[in-house]
Amino acid sequence: MWLSCTAHALHDGYTDMIYALLPVWQTEFGLSYGALAILRGVYAGTMATLQLPAGRLARKFGTRATLAVGTLLAALGYAAAGISGTLLGLCVALAISGGGSSTQHPLASGAVSRVYGRNARGPLSIYNFSGDLGKSALPAAISLLITVMPWRHALWAVSIVGVLVAAVIALFLPSIPRGDSSMQKASRQHSNDSRSGFSLLFTIGVLDTAVRMGLLTFLPFLLKTKGISQSMTGTALALVFIGGAAGKFLCGWLGARVGVIGTVFATEGGTAALILAVIYLPLTPAMVLLPLLGAMLNGTSSVLYGTVPELTSVDRTERAFALFYTGTIASGALSPVVYGFLGDQIGVHGATIATAATALAVLPLALALRPHLRTT
């Protein structure tokens, strides 16, 4: 459980610290918003594409070996980014790192779900929370490091952390059971899988991710128009991610009381309202709202991930998680590109407003999902 959380924190931190590096790379390589979004898309796209193959590799070589090698590749990719001298070299390095990170979500979340069975919603919330810890720590750390050293040296420093985590996983991650009596019992209870329900959940996850990734792509530039400094950009992102971590716990509590649908309505509606507030408010009040925006922005995902086992049988858990993460990560890769080119056409403010509209599009889908959820 705790090694899965450690892996999640590292890989999510690696994924989201790209946002803090985008302004640096824009200056270094003279990139447009669309090109910056493509850089983010290279990492996320590679990660999404290799989710299902990572699951097959784990069945052949074991979860521990596959996750350890993937973590090592993610670290080495960032080390390679630190020595890249061209935009193409940077793209290749990010593809290597994204490929390594493809192992983490399906294997670590599947392991937690298998170990805890029907009681996995709570542990999965802790697992998701650990990812937000990484999202809070690494973007802030890289932003601080690039103020005291060249950005290339900063990447080498964070890659060393990944190498150490890979070694710990290889040495200490226990074998993951493929099934036991409690899992088999839960599997029988879930024998009537809701494919249409899973499809709706999948679509909601894709749109929710599009909102999150699209907004995070533009947030540094939106704040830059308000006069924020480079060092404070990392702090602003950390505020969003810290709020997101709190949102995981908040939505777990909220979901237990008002249900999945009520929670989704609260978080997506709140996200749309707060995005508009951050756009139009001055810098100081906008910064104050960032933790709450993060809670709304990331809170939905915790409820969605915990619902995946409810809509599939236990013997298909890892495949269901792989499919779900493939869709959400693919959305994370493609949506910033779409919003990025939209930003080139209509500006940062217009594209950011489009992310708020996407959040509102989730609401009718959530209503359609209601009949497919367990009432117990």
Where in this protein do the model-derived segments appear?
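A late C-terminal transmembrane helix in Major Facilitator Superfamily
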Residues: K135, P309-V348
